[in-house]
Amino acid sequence: MKIPILIMCIMVLLGINNDDIRYSDKKETNTLFQEDFEKATLDEVFQNWSNRKNTKGMSFSQDVPNGSRGKKSLMMTYVAGKDEGAHLFKSFPEGHEKLYARFYVKFLTSRSPIHHLVKLGGYQPAAPYPLGLAGLKPNGEDFLMSGIELPDNKNWSWGFYTYWMHMMGSPKKYWGNVFLPETEKSIPLGEWICVEFMIKLNDPVHSFNGEQAFWINGKKILHLGMGFPKIQHSGGYFKESSSGIPFKGFQWRKNKKLKLTLFWLNYYMTKGVEGEVDQILFDDIVISNQYIGPLKK
């Protein structure tokens, strides 16, 4: 009995509690980053991230996904005409060739259109905060970005919104290109959804063997790579189609120095009726070099 008591005394002296052990930030193999929002305060949560926006619009919720080992999730709140939602940003300055991001999300309301959601990407050089690059075409050396989003807010369904060196656009402005699965995956309100997506960089850099894919509740919905799937596209709008032509693949970069350096938990809102409130929940975030999958129930 003396050894357990001694261990507990050491934990108290070091300021460690049971939650810190149970909810370790790196408890899975190949896990680079983990966030379960189980800290005592939001300020402690923010220490796990590189950058944040609108902390007043964030709060804890007692609503958690089925299978979660925790008791709290993060709520982000948008007030139309007052703010632009909120975000948490994590930088990985060491850079990676492939990243998987899994998170749980619950849309509580749908009053205002969602401008942007969660993203993976890379800056060269890496930055500890989001850079203002909207409307710019990457040159293969400076940046790449892809978000798992709602590209068509009138029809709530999942898709990619992607910036890369061969994206389509006008000579003056390049907005993210949209990638959709052949069968739309609709997004329900008031339900926890397990979302996972990945980016694999092209190697060698002159090749088009880069990829991206996403899964909803553990089911792969769309996977894009060199020669697959068949795609129909018009301008910057790409849709999986059995009657299309094989997708060329992604040349994400032409310089090996450009790597994946960021995860952006984004709830970016810009429209809506002034004063109306929208809210979203996030929980159980994991960033890894390999597929993660849903929580075990």
Q: Would you name each region that the model predicts?
A:
Residues 37, 194-246:
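Carbohydrate-binding surfaces in secreted/extracellular proteins
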Residues 43-73:
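Extracellular glycan-recognition surfaces and repeat-rich motifs
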Residues 86-87, 111-133, 206-211:
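Beta-strand acidic-aromatic groove motif in beta-rich domains, primarily in extracellular
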Residues 189, 207-213, 271-284, 295:
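Extracellular carbohydrate recognition
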